[in-house]
């Protein structure tokens, strides 16, 4: 049986690094991916490169300036002008972040995608993937992922699902 491949979203931070470590411990072959949302995001990309090098992990960088502007910035500004305060991450996750990461994973031959979010995906009989709260309720981030599609959820591994953050 071949080793399953995971494309893990990394930020250069602790949570995504721990997620990569846990996936490797579980026997997955892991490569990293980071989205460059704008030129101002280049420092985060460089931070992720340093971490990826330290972890001896290939890193894929997806430049998505246009998608981020169209799917997140412009809708955020429209909502804000209407007196609402939208959460940009909730706008970004299904339309940009996970859409692009899942697309890249499929094109590059990965079996799964992963992030360092604190939430759970439950795979039910019949193939339905259901988003659930993290076992660590004080760190739960399921609300950030509630708009993901079935396709996105079915590909998603969340290795931090049962961990607390100290």
Task: Give a label for each model feature.
Residues 150:
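Gly-rich Lys/Arg/Thr-decorated short loops/hinges at beta-loop-alpha junctions or inter-strand turns
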Residues 1-147, 157, 163-166:
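ATP-dependent adenylation/nucleotidyltransferase module used to activate substrates
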Residues 154:
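Short, glycine-/aromatic-enriched active-site segment of Class I SAM-dependent methyltransferases
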């Amino acid at each position: 049986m071949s080793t399953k491949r995971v494309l893990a979203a990394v930020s250069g931070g602790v949570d995504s690094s721990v997620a990569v470590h846990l996936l490797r411990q579980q026997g997955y072959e892991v490569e990293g991916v980071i989205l460059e949302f704008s030129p101002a995001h280049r420092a985060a990309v460089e931070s992720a490169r340093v971490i990826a090098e330290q972890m001896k992990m290939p890193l894929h960088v997806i430049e998505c300036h246009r998608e981020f502007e169209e799917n997140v910035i412009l809708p955020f500004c429209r909502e804000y002008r209407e007196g609402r305060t939208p959460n940009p991450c909730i706008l970004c996750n299904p339309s940009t972040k996970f859409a692009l990461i899942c697309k890249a994973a499929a094109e590059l031959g990965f079996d799964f995608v992963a992030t360092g979010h604190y939430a759970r995906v439950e795979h039910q009989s019949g193939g339905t993937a259901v988003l659930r709260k993290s076992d660590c309720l004080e760190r739960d981030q399921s609300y950030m992922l509630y708009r993901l599609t079935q396709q996105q959820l079915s590909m998603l591994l969340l290795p931090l699902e049962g961990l607390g953050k100290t």
